[in-house]
Amino acid sequence: WDTFAMEGRGIRCVSDEPWVTAAETAECSLAHAAVGDLSTATDLLYWTRAHRTDDGSYMTGIVYPSFEHFPAGERTAYTGAAVIMAADAITASSPAAKLFLPTFAAD
């Protein structure tokens, strides 16, 4: 956690650079939800909001402390999808949320 998490900002995609991505952060949220740690999962999902643009899409990454978006202007479908899956895993809003529950394999 200490290597990759930038508290309140997100999850780094590499350990030695000061940038976080919404997708890495959402994927970490999914992992926490899958093991039942919904508090941390919710915090991580909240951290992705800094990446959200006015049109609802998500910038791929943010460099800190400069707040530069990288790659410049990039808003990928996989980033939005990761955020949606994390939200669903936490809230169980759709049947797909069961994919991330520890009991899914037993169903």
Short names for language-model regions:
Residues 21-25:
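Generic helix N-cap/helix-start motif at coil->alpha-helix transitions
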Residues 39-40:
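Alpha-helical positions within canonical tetratricopeptide repeat
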Residues 29-32, 87:
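Residue at a conserved register position within TPR or TPR-like alpha-solenoid repeats
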